[in-house]
């Protein structure tokens, strides 16, 4: 499910062994990206105030770094190795820092969140956006564009969005609706999509039954073809329309 994917992989600890961040002002970046890219879409009906309220709800949501202090670095190599090994499993994992959370009341997409709470604010925001009708249509459109054509028929998008809503965001069922549809097998969709450079390289390696290469060489080939790994400069990701990769 979309929501479980967004909400998974994080412990519930609220007592991280790191210093609380200083108050540096509200950053709207992820609030905007959550609404614009991952859920409702750019035309999903949210406002600038919704962006601010979502950003407020997500204050305190962060991850565990591991930055050894000077004393740790001066310890014997064996002790330091054990220390790093003990901390590595937690590095990069989610944690909620209540010391930097905005606990005031909020209103997100017309839904009121009472004040005085903590991590529940962000969890409620995920519930709200996951079940918003615009999210169903946005995700359905992206998947139909990925599997059928650059301009998928509205009728297919409607059915896929209805599946998203009916199954509470079950992506597998949405994909099933798309790939078993008459539009998927239509002549209009035949060869309407092309592989990205990444897909070209990976499919070639699979066809050759090549062993995985941990060196940077494979990534370098993908980059030479125009799609450097993690090289997209904007947060919307690489284009998923055929016209961008033909020519």
Task: Please place each PLM-identified region on the residue numbering.
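Acidic/polar loop patches that form or flank catalytic/metal-binding clefts of enzymes
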Residues: 47, 65-67, 171-173, 186-187
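Charged/polar, low-hydrophobicity segments characteristic of intrinsically disordered regions
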Residues: 68-72, 171-181
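Non-catalytic, conformational "gating/processing" segments within enzyme and secreted inhibitor domains
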Residues: 1-151
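Alpha-helix capping and helix-coil boundary motifs
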Residues: 117-121, 169-170, 196
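Flexible, low-complexity segments enriched for small/polar residues
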Residues: 132, 136-167, 176-247
């Amino acid at each position: 499910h979309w929501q479980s994917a967004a909400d998974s992989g994080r412990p519930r600890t609220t007592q991280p062994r790191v210093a609380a961040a200083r108050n540096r002002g509200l950053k709207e970046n992820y609030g905007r990206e959550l609404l614009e890219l991952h859920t409702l879409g750019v035309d999903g009906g949210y406002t600038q105030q919704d962006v601010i309220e979502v950003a407020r709800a997500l204050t305190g949501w962060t991850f565990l770094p591991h930055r050894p202090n000077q004393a740790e670095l001066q310890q014997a190599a064996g002790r330091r190795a054990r220390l790093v090994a003990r901390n590595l499993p937690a590095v990069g994992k989610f944690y909620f820092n209540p010391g930097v959370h905005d606990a005031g009341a909020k209103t997100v997409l017309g839904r009121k969140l009472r004040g005085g709470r903590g991590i529940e604010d962000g969890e409620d925001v995920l519930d709200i956006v996951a079940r918003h009708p615009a999210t169903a249509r946005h995700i359905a459109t992206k998947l139909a564009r990925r599997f059928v054509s650059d301009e998928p028929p509205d009728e297919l998008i409607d059915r896929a969005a209805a599946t998203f809503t009916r199954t509470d965001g079950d992506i597998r069922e949405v994909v099933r609706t798309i790939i078993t549809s008459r539009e998927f097998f239509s002549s209009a969709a035949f060869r309407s999509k092309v592989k990205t450079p990444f897909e070209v390289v990976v499919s070639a390696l699979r066809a050759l039954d090549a062993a995985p290469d941990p060196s940077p060489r494979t990534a370098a080939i993908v980059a030479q073809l125009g799609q450097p790994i993690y090289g997209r400069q904007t947060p919307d990701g690489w284009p998923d329309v055929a016209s961008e990769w033909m020519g």
